[in-house]
Amino acid sequence: MLENHFETTPFLLGNKPLSSDFAFYGQMTQLIGFDPTSREIALELSPRSVAWVDIMEDLSGFNEDSSHLLSIENLPETTFSIFEELSHGYVPAMIANSIAFKEGQETWSTKIDDQMWEQKTFPYQAKCLEWIRDEFNELDQDDKTKVFNFLKETGCEKLLIGKE
C-alpha cells in the first residue's frame, strides 16, 4: 500500500512533508529504523517506505507554506487506500482507548479485523483523538463537509463521531 502511494507522491499529502508525515515517521522509525526483522520485511515488500523513512530523517524545520498541498479532490487513490486501512485498526483502537481513558480504565479491548485486541490505555492517544476532533471543529463548514465526506468514504468518520 505505501509502496504504491510513494510511487505517486513523495509524502503523505503532497510534495512536501507535513506534520502528518512527521507523526507517521515517528511510528515508522520503530518498524524500519530499529527493528532488523521488520526492516528486512519492509525492504522486500516496500523499499520506497524504507527510502521515505531515510529521507524524513534528514529533513529539518517545518514549512507552513501550503501551496504544495494536494486538494482533497485531487488526492491519489493510494491515499484512500491508506485511510481505509486505518479504519480497520487505528480508528477502533483510538476510540476504544479514548473511552477507556474517560472511564478511568487501565486497559481497553475492541474488535480489530474480527479479532479481539486488548491494550493498556494511553492518555496521549486519547489526547490525539481530542486534537483531531478539535482541529476538525475549527474548519469552516465547506471544509468540514469535504473532510467528513472523505473520512466517511474511507470508513474513518468514526474518529469524529465515535461512541463516546
Where are these regions (language model features)?
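GST-like fold's C-terminal all-alpha helical module
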Residues: M1-F62, S67-E153, L159-E164
